């Protein structure tokens, strides 16, 4: 189904539900340690590692530095945990911090890892990757004719970024396409405008969020004001929030975007850690989405945004922060969710800087919607399913090797066992 057709369905949904009473960062968190974590080091395992180290130093046919060996050991230790945990060297850590600021030199795509290869979660709008035809679910088999097998995501990012204007070649593997796809791209400064908007027709607004960044919450406020102005100052009768192919981003951005549409202090998301231990509870309040001590970006938000009938669009490329928003608005019956089942990345990554300037990113908890649903490996099921017939392949969290299963039970949803809703349309 084309984008224009899906928007028409969303507009119809807005009209159908307008009579219903509408109720109602990457961010580092301090890792808590339980007493049982304070165990002694496994001496025999340390001895085994030292023995392997000694054999490499004595017998490997090339000389390897101690730094390279120990970096490799740390990468292997962390990467085997799950697809999103990762050891980052100094450069990888710096690149990761840069990517959330909204401007960087590269190709413009969100990537992950599966079976030792780099996989595209979603290309970013209006970037070299999107213009070259890179699609969600593509595997990047080679970068400049060098295999990506075994690369971490931060290592792949490092290889794909570079001086603007320089050339790079990616070899892609795409499901149901027999031959490798070779694309030639030119690196560019990626200025990600995370919020776009326009009037679909008089009285009906459209807001697109492509990624959750530092200015996304303020961008929602600016978009709402601009839509009202474009509507000649008249109140809007409905709004569409498009989160399709939004790979996520900053947690506080997700909380702030949710807060723009929810009553004050409404629960947005919570976390649970090891053994179901309760973690954070984040609500629609400034202290839970303001990154610094600055002004509330929603302070002068048009009041109608809290009650206006709305539809949220999602698909299998909607991940992480976008799933938090869709889940919160769905649970509070604030919006009708339309599209296909989302990606299912419901895990919290804690970024822990290390003393040498590197960092380790660890999965430390899972996200839960206001109604205590876990997003992990199952995603958000739309209220109204509308399949995108132009989308040949759906890729989800449950397709990733080593993914964490949903703690509440039920079948993890991958590309081969999507859950259909009662309203599904073929």
Spell out what each predicted region is.
Residues 2-239, 245-247, 260-263, 421-425:
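Flexible, low-complexity junctional segments that flank or bridge functional domains
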Residues 23, 195-426:
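C-terminal "post-core" interaction segments
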């Amino acid at each position: 189904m084309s984008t224009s057709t899906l928007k028409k369905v969303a507009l119809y949904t807005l009209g159908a539900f307008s009579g219903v009473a509408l109720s109602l960062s990457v961010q580092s968190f301090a890792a808590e340690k339980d007493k049982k974590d304070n165990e002694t080091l496994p001496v025999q395992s340390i001895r085994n590692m030292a023995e392997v180290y000694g054999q490499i130093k004595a017998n490997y046919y090339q000389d390897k530095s101690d730094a390279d060996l120990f970096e490799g050991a740390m990468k292997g230790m962390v990467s085997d945990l799950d697809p999103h945990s990762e050891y980052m060297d100094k450069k990888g850590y710096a690149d990761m911090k840069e990517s959330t600021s909204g401007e960087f030199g590269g190709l413009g795509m969100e990537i992950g890892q599966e079976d030792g290869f780099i996989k595209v979660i979603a290309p970013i709008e209006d970037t070299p990757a999107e213009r070259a035809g890179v699609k969600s679910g593509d595997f990047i088999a080679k970068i400049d004719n060098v295999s990506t097998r075994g690369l971490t995501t931060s290592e792949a990012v490092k290889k794909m970024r570079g001086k603007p204007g320089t050339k790079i070649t990616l070899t892609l593997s795409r499901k149901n396409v027999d031959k490798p796809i070779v694309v030639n791209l030119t690196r560019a400064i990626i200025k990600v405008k995370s919020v776009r908007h326009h009037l679909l027709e008089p009285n009906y607004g459209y807001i697109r969020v492509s990624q959750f960044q530092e200015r996304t919450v303020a961008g929602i406020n600016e978009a709402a004001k601009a839509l009202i102005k474009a509507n000649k100052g008249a109140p809007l009768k409905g709004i569409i929030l498009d989160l399709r192919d939004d790979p996520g981003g900053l947690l506080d951005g997700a909380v702030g975007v949710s807060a723009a549409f929810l009553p004050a202090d409404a629960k947005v998301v919570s976390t649970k850690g090891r053994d179901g231990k309760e973690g954070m509870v984040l609500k629609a309040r400034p202290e839970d989405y303001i990154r610094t001590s600055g002004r509330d970006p929603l302070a002068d938000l048009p009041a109608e945004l809290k009650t206006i009938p709305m539809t949220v669009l999602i698909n299998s490329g909607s991940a992480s922060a976008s799933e938090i928003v869709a889940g919160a608005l769905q649970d509070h019956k604030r919006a009708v969710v339309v599209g296909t089942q989302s990606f299912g990345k419901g895990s919290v990554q804690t970024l822990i800087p290390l003393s040498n300037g590197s960092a380790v990113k660890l999965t430390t908890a899972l996200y839960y919607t206001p109604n205590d649903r876990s997003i992990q490996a199952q995603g958000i099921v739309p209220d109204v399913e509308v399949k995108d017939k132009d989308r040949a392949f759906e890729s989800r969290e449950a397709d990733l090797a080593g993914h964490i299963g949903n703690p509440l039970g039920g079948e993890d949803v991958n590309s081969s066992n999507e859950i259909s809703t009662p309203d599904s349309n073929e």
